[in-house]
Amino acid sequence: MKSFKIISLLLAILFLASCQTNTASDDEALETVEVMLDWYPNAVHTFLYVAIENGYFAEEGLDVDIVFPTNPTDPIQLTASGAIPLALSYQPDVILARSKDLPVVSVASVVRSPLNHVMFLAEQDFDSPADLVGLTVGYPGIPVNEPILKTMVEAAGGDYEQVHLMDVGFELGASIVSGRADAVVGTYINHEYPVLKHEGHDISYFNPVDYGVPEYDELVLISNEAYVEESGEVLAAFWRAALKGYEWMVENPDEALNVLLTNQDEANFPLIQEVEEESLSILLEKMENPNGPFGGQDAESWEEVISWLDAHDWLEQPVVAEDAFSSITD
């Protein structure tokens, strides 16, 4: 009887050790992939958090680690250097970066039309972007905002050279509320606008597409040329999981938003539920691809944005559309 107990105990120990070994092996099998957001976590990132929470990345053998930028230019700079394999950025910024020989590549479209609007307190009573001449416009230091603002001011008949542009970092809404800036560009219709409304401010805005700016992709997933060439299977696996997260978000928007709110960085970037609800309702339409799968890209869109930037002398050297993006959605 005593021998039986000893054998049973040994078998139990071996079983537990086997379980622990299998768990460790499973964890070791996952490849860690860092993804840098374009901003702090908000509704546009919901599909990524859903893919993590629902285990879609793990099913593809990936352990996805979401990191935040310390300043608005980090996604482009750190991806170009290879310090970060994946990041969220903006279609025009990818083109501007490539014109400076930075080896960044868009691998998927996330938001298919501009969210970026010029915003100001309604009491300013501006009629068009031409009214910004002689005034101070805040922006987050992201290069794409300059050609956007220049195009808008000139389309409205104003002299862009007489607009004072001031880098306010992430303090976009605060800069117009405090009076530090008369208006801001780089503010999003799905984020700063509902946030400022929630805070009790009456806000007006100009949509860039009404003033000569093309319908560019607001948000794209970027990588660098070397990673795209060497890690194509990882990128494909990443997007398969991201697509599942997106589809689940579309079918279950309320539950998906709860996933985001549960995973928010409340200490540093607290989210407001009603703001994120309004934001997600705006985003769902703008993220949908009517001509193919979520994330799909085409040369025509890239050529249009390249032509716009080139026409306004923002490109340091020519950019070939086909070199600026690589499809991982097929």
Curated annotation (Swiss-Prot):
Pfam families: NMT1. A lipid is attached at C19 (S-diacylglycerol cysteine). Substrate binds at D38, W39, Y90, N145, Y188, E192. InterPro entries: NMT1/THI5 (IPR027939), SsuA/THI5 (IPR015168). It comes from the Bacteria. Belongs to the NMT1 family. Participates in a thiamine pyrimidine salvage pathway as part of the ABC transporter complex ThiXYZ involved in the import of thiamine degradation products. Binds the formylaminopyrimidine N-formyl-4-amino-5-aminomethyl-2-methylpyrimidine (FAMP). Does not bind thiamine. This is Formylaminopyrimidine-binding protein. It comes from Halalkalibacterium halodurans (strain ATCC BAA-125 / DSM 18197 / FERM 7344 / JCM 9153 / C-125). The lineage of its organism: Bacteria, Bacillati, Bacillota, Bacilli, Bacillales.
